[in-house]
Amino acid sequence: LFKRRYQHDRLLQTIRNKQDKARDEYQRDCEQLETLLIPEECKERLKATRSRENYARYYGHKYNEPDLMPGWAAMEELTLGELSFLYSGLNRDADKKSIAKRLNLAAPLLESWLHCLTVIRNICAHHARLWNREPGIKPKLPKTVSFPWPSNLQQQEQHHRMFTVLSILNLLM
């Protein structure tokens, strides 16, 4: 499923950590609820509601095995960077193409865009200046366009500022 160099143990550990964190947070929430001076049935309702706040929390509360939640649920818990790393680590081009096809994109294009968006997200998350900046990584541009794409981005050399990234985001949304 993954390339040899792909650190799938890292992905599994990330998912385990998210589940463990969700379980610990739920336990802490339950302990706090026990200190409230409200009827027991209200406490139980609040605990039930809190157990369903996200799937990692729900899975840890509801199931003992298998250890890890289903893949579809794990995808919901991964960050953009983790999803980008996962996509780039897929071994078979057919798998990448299948995912990219759902977005009407070529697989190398999607991989490039995910990486670029991850870099931009990290710039924003660390409160760095984004405007009028060259992000350091240029996203690949489509060779042939089968979707709405700005005509001024048809030339390969004119895509080193934020307009390209905003166009990518617009297309993916």
Model-predicted regions and their roles:
Residues 1-173:
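Long, contiguous internal "core" modules enriched in hydrophobic/ aromatic residues
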